[in-house]
Structures are given as C-alpha cells and as structure tokens.
C-alpha cells in the first residue's frame, strides 16, 4: 500500500 507521505510530497 502506498504511504500517504508520498502523496503529500507530490502536492
């Protein structure tokens, strides 16, 4: 499962 931090780093 992809970690939420990776998503925030993209923003």
Curated annotation (Swiss-Prot):
Localization terms from the record: Secreted
Coiled-coil region: none
Tissue specificity: Expressed by the skin glands.
One Pfam family recorded for the sequence: Tachykinin
Gene Ontology cellular component terms for the protein in this record: extracellular region
Keywords recorded for this protein, A-Z: Amidation, Amphibian defense peptide, Neuropeptide, Pyrrolidone carboxylic acid, Secreted
InterPro entries in alphabetical order: Tachy_Neuro_lke_CS, Tachykinin_dom
Residues modified to Pyrrolidone carboxylic acid: 1
Modified residues (Methionine amide): 11
GO biological process assignments: defense response; neuropeptide signaling pathway; tachykinin receptor signaling pathway
Entry keyword annotation includes Secreted: yes
Cleaved signal peptide residues: none
Function: Tachykinins are active peptides which excite neurons, evoke behavioral responses, are potent vasodilators and secretagogues, and contract (directly or indirectly) many smooth muscles.
Family from the record: Belongs to the tachykinin family.
Official protein name in the record: Uperolein
Species of origin: Uperoleia rugosa
């Amino acid at each position: 499962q992809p970690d939420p931090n990776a998503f925030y780093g993209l923003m």
